[in-house]
Amino acid sequence: MRVLITGVTGFVGSHLAEHCLELGHEVAGTFRWRSRDENLSVVKGKVALHDADLRDPVGVRTVIQAFQPERIFHLAAQSYVHASWASPAETLSTNIISQVNLLEAVREAGLTECRIQVAGSSEEYGMVFPDETPIKETNPLRPLSPYAVSKVAQDLMGYQYHESYGMFIVRTRSFNHEGPRRGEVFVTSNFAKQIAEIEKGLKEPVIHVGNLEAFRDYTDVRDIIRAYILSLEKCESGEVYNIGSGNAWQIGDMLSTLLDYSNVSVEVRQDPARMRPSDVPRLECDASKFKKATGWEPEIPFETTLKDTLDYWRERV
């Protein structure tokens, strides 16, 4: 099967590419010219790479017409919530216009059998009240960041293209996913990198943190990619599905667990620059709809994910 992964050089895209190759699929991926490709070191030469800025409709059409994908996992995005506050227009442009161009290219190419996964986010739910957790797909969307607004737009656009043109599109709302290769701007990976640097004497024994009070539902990326593949095989077109573990961790407890895997003594210091103008206090997933449709269950304990992430940074700092 011909599988196209947008954002293939990224954290999730690289893991997904490896797994698709293991399943025997022909894999292609899009990337932007300034993207770093070290995440693809294991599969270099096995994935057809297309240098394409998805905001350019001509470039997107060229890729779609050349590869004729049967499955598309649309992962490319400006995915850092904090950066969306500094660059709201770029975040909205990157995430919304890119998807318009992708869906239009598939439609214009007449690929009626192509199945598309739109990777949404739990951030779409935004302000969730205590009596609304665990969060179901029917919960109101109250986005609290420009990033979240962009993902709501992508989500609804996927629904609209399914309804308007009969395209096979499954929308997923993934809760936090972590593991090796996670970008250092994201909190779990950032803490792990700081600890690895302290262990090697590369920085003072101070962990700089933002909001440690928030709760997040964490799943290992290696479980998430299995879920994404199942979403296009088992789920209903036009529907939306939550994907997550159903276990909410307080960020402070996540940091404590990482520190338990190290023998360094550190000071934890709050950095005002790491605080968001508004933050989602608790995100906890109800993935029962997705599990019923696919039979998926997360297999990797979060403690293992944290240990693997710390070991990843120990090898790189």
Where are these regions (language model features)?
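Amphipathic terminal alpha-helices
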Residues: 2, 25, 302-317
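Generic structural signal for alpha-helix termini and adjacent loop/cap motifs
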Residues: 15, 87, 105, 109, ...
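Mid/C-terminal beta-alpha module of Rossmann-like enzyme folds, strongest
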Residues: 190-191, 234-275, 287
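NAD(P)-dependent short-chain dehydrogenase/reductase
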Residues: 128-134, 156-217, 221-232, 246-248, ...
